[in-house]
């Protein structure tokens, strides 16, 4: 239990926050935009915290890059963009969506946010409203895009009431907005020493492989479905 509690205590740490836009895995933003359009690739973007950013690892070892490997192995015409940002709370994520992300090309958006709100004991209703606003912004600005919501779990030492409110916010948001839902990003990784860095806190390369595996189980059918729909379109 305490290992799980500790695993939440560092989500807000990692690379310094940057105002630079994320670069697609595998090259510069300009190069990847060019190659994507040339090859008729579609974009799946990962909006997230240090868990998506890949704290303590090279970007190619973070789970979004592992997802790209799975996409390539499956021969699917999709490109991953890792838009993770360490230390980001849901309000800042919303601001990024409104000012930058909504202007980027993407067909599927994976949303992972809220962990850093939880670390500071931020009001759950406020966090939930921010996530809802992210969903609303994407639906209004990119109505054809598919949103996948990633759930998070609160540290038990925050108290039963807070834990219940926080943990319940994500499945409820997914249900109310009819979104594809991944219940817990760190399933099978949180608190497992062999899957975390030497500090016993952050997922290591093996941990990110596990994360990529269970994210892929949800993401793959979405990409195949949307790829088929695109191919069938006149």
Residue ranges: model-predicted function:
Residues 94-234:
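Alpha-helical cap/lid subdomain in secreted, periplasmic
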Residues 9, 79-81, 148:
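Conserved Rossmann-like nucleotide-binding pocket used by diverse enzymes
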Residues 52-53, 73, 87, 117, ...:
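Active-site micro-motifs of SAM-dependent methyltransferase domains
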Residues 1-11:
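Sec-dependent bacterial lipoprotein signal peptides
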Residues 85-89, 158-160:
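Short, flexible loop segments at the rims of nucleotide/cofactor-binding pockets, characterized by
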Residues 13-17:
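Bacterial signal peptide processing site
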Residues 9, 72, 175:
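Short polybasic/polar patches that bind polyanions
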Residues 20-86, 96-105:
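Serine-esterase "nucleophile elbow" of acetyl-processing enzymes
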């Amino acid at each position: 239990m305490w290992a799980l509690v500790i695993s939440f205590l560092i989500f807000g740490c990692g690379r310094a926050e940057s105002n630079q836009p994320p670069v697609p895995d595998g090259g510069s933003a300009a190069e990847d935009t060019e190659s994507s359009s040339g090859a008729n690739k579609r974009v799946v973007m990962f909006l997230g915290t240090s868990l998506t950013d890949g704290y303590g690892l090279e970007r190619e070892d973070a789970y979004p890059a592992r997802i790209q490997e799975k996409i390539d192995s499956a021969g699917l015409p999709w490109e991953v963009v890792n838009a993770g940002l360490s230390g980001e709370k849901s309000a800042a994520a919303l601001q990024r969506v409104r000012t930058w992300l909504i202007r980027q090309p993407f067909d599927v958006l994976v949303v992972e946010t809220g962990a850093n709100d939880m670390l500071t004991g931020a009001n759950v209703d406020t966090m939930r409203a921010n996530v809802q606003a992210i969903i609303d912004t994407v639906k209004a600005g990119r109505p054809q895009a598919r949103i996948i919501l990633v759930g998070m779990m609160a540290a038990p030492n925050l108290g039963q009431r807070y834990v219940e409110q926080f943990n319940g916010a994500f499945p409820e948001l997914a249900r109310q907005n009819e979104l594809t839902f991944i219940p817990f990003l760190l399933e099978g990784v949180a608190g497992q020493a062999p899957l975390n860095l030497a500090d016993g806190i952050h997922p290591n390369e093996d941990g990110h492989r596990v994360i990529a595996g269970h994210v892929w189980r949800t993401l793959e059918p979405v990409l195949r479905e949307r790829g088929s729909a695109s191919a069938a379109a006149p």
